[in-house]
UniProtKB/Swiss-Prot annotation, chain A:
<dbReference type="GO" id="GO:0008757">
    <property type="term" value="F:S-adenosylmethionine-dependent methyltransferase activity"/>
</dbReference>
<comment type="similarity">
    <text>Belongs to the methyltransferase superfamily.</text>
</comment>
<dbReference type="GO" id="GO:0032259">
    <property type="term" value="P:methylation"/>
</dbReference>
<keyword id="KW-0809">Transit peptide</keyword>
<keyword id="KW-0999">Mitochondrion inner membrane</keyword>
<dbReference type="GO" id="GO:0032981">
    <property type="term" value="P:mitochondrial respiratory chain complex I assembly"/>
</dbReference>
<keyword id="KW-0560">Oxidoreductase</keyword>
<keyword id="KW-0472">Membrane</keyword>
<dbReference type="GO" id="GO:0005739">
    <property type="term" value="C:mitochondrion"/>
</dbReference>
<comment type="function">
    <text>Arginine hydroxylase that mediates hydroxylation of 'Arg-111' of NDUFS7 and is involved in the assembly of mitochondrial NADH:ubiquinone oxidoreductase complex (complex I, MT-ND1) at early stages. May also have methyltransferase activity.</text>
</comment>
<dbReference type="InterPro" id="IPR013216">
    <property type="entry name" value="Methyltransf_11"/>
</dbReference>
<dbReference type="InterPro" id="IPR029063">
    <property type="entry name" value="SAM-dependent_MTases_sf"/>
</dbReference>
<feature type="transit peptide" description="Mitochondrion">
    <location>
        <begin position="1"/>
        <end position="36"/>
    </location>
</feature>
<dbReference type="Pfam" id="PF08241">
    <property type="entry name" value="Methyltransf_11"/>
</dbReference>
<protein>
    <recommendedName>
        <fullName>Arginine-hydroxylase NDUFAF5, mitochondrial</fullName>
        <ecNumber>1.-.-.-</ecNumber>
        <ecNumber>2.1.1.-</ecNumber>
    </recommendedName>
</protein>
<dbReference type="GO" id="GO:0004497">
    <property type="term" value="F:monooxygenase activity"/>
</dbReference>
<dbReference type="InterPro" id="IPR050602">
    <property type="entry name" value="Malonyl-ACP_OMT"/>
</dbReference>
Length: 345, 74
């Protein structure tokens, strides 16, 4: 595997020089594994991307693929709502980490001209959902996008960025492939997601085994999200949060559904074994601490929606300092001010 | 995973029976849960085997439920 690895490193170093597409495609062969002696000192390697690809492939070829789709369908429809909120048409759009294409099914031909679906799992792309928009499926890792600068009018990403190792870099790449005045609409799982499961496992493992190891992956906090988007170069940021609570009969059903969604743990520091005693204890604790009146247990999914724009001259900018014509003290007389058409920003 | 996934399938089917056996042992599970929850109150400290007694009761109930279903069917 020496030659492809060498070529891949060459591609990474000449990233700024816009390497032609056929060489970039070779990245997929060694993608997902960060080089040990990497160029950037801040490169993190938390998740095993290879294992994540295997998990998503397994999840996508299950006998009943729609059984576990409910969460992604819901978030996909909410992202499509946000796309419709923007009164514009997008000739070329990209869906990063699309899974089976949950966003495309809610959009129409008038809004999106052509849709690129990118995911690391080929089984998911093969079983994609029906949509009226012409699509192109690309096997690509969210951190190593094989696209040129200033390509897309719209990039969407639904519930897949929480598995990337280097989120700042992924966001920078998204910014890079967007056209000026292009928009990125993303949804990712936030800090409070599955806190009930995390707490139950933590308590049970401490009581049963004397210590605990992380079973739920670390999520981004909402403050960090704003900073990351700003650092990646996005303009006019909007971050809002949504909480979806799903009730399950018990902890085991929740874990089975998470596995069916392809959301199993793939961090390098995961413990390989979860004892049956610990699982039993955790299920008992979960039920006792968090159950609803009807006996079911809730699981919280906190979703952060973010919208960021790539800079363009036509976009609104903050006004110059000292250019105010009205002061805040006159806010009480706003009725007199408004008919004059003299509103201060 | 092995070629036909026999071991994985067996382990998974055993795991799938856990929820119904846990449902049988509702009282013991609640007692264990309450004990652990009490340790999270301010001033409490959760250490290993803090609720060992309650957990033993839960585990023996669970094993009895498992034996019953084994004798009962499949």
């Amino acid at each position: 595997m020496l030659r492809p690895a060498g070529l891949w490193r060459l591609c990474r170093l000449s990233w700024a020089a816009r390497v032609p597409a056929e060489n970039l495609g070779r990245r997929d062969v060694t993608s997902g594994v960060s080089p040990r002696g990497s160029t950037s000192p801040r490169t993190l390697n938390i998740f095993d991307r290879d294992l994540k690809r295997k998990q998503k492939n397994w999840a996508a070829q299950q006998p009943e693929p729609t059984k576990f789709d409910y969460l992604k369908e819901e978030v996909g429809s909410r992202i499509a709502d946000r796309v419709y909120d923007i009164p514009r048409n997008f000739p070329l759009a990209l869906d990063l980490g699309c899974g089976r294409g949950y966003i495309a099914q809610y959009l129409n031909k008038e809004t999106i001209g052509k849709f690129f679906q990118a995911d690391i799992a080929e089984n998911a792309l093969k079983n994609s959902l029906e949509t009226e928009i012409p699509t192109v499926s690309v096997l690509a890792d969210e951190e190593f996008l094989p696209f040129r600068e200033n390509t897309f009018d719209l990039v969407v990403s639904s519930l897949s960025l929480h598995w990337v190792n280097d989120l700042p870099r992924a966001l920078e790449q998204i910014h890079y492939i967007l056209k000026p005045d292009g928009v990125f609409i993303g949804a990712m799982f936030g800090g409070d997601t599955l806190y009930e499961l995390r707490c139950s496992l933590q308590l049970a493992e401490t009581e049963r085994e004397g210590g605990f190891s992380p079973h739920i992956s670390p999520f981004t906090a909402v403050n960090d999200l704003g900073h990351l988007l700003g650092r990646a170069g996005f303009n006019t940021l909007t971050v809002d949060t949504d909480e979806i609570q799903v009730n399950y009969p018990g902890m085991f059903e929740l874990m089975e559904d998470l596995q069916g969604m392809g959301e199993s743990n793939c961090s390098w520091n995961r413990k390989a074994l979860l004892h049956r005693d610990t699982m039993l204890a955790a299920a008992a604790v979960y039920r006792e601490m968090y159950r609803n009146e009807d006996g079911s247990v809730p699981a919280t999914y906190q979703i952060y929606y973010m919208i960021g724009w790539k800079y363009h001259e036509s976009q609104a900018r903050p006004a110059e300092r000292g250019s105010a014509t009205v002061s805040f003290g006159e806010l009480g007389k706003i009725n007199n001010l408004m008919p004059q058409g003299n509103k201060s920003q | 995973m092995s070629a036909n996934g026999a071991v994985w399938g067996r382990v998974r089917s055993r795991l799938r029976a856990f929820p119904e056996r846990l449902a049988v042992c509702g009282a013991e599970a609640a007692a264990y849960g309450r004990c652990v929850q009490a340790s999270t109150a301010p001033g409490g400290r959760l250490s290993k085997d803090f609720c060992a007694r309650e957990f033993e009761a839960l585990r023996s109930c669970f094993a009895a439920a498992a034996k019953k279903t084994l004798e009962g069917g499949c």
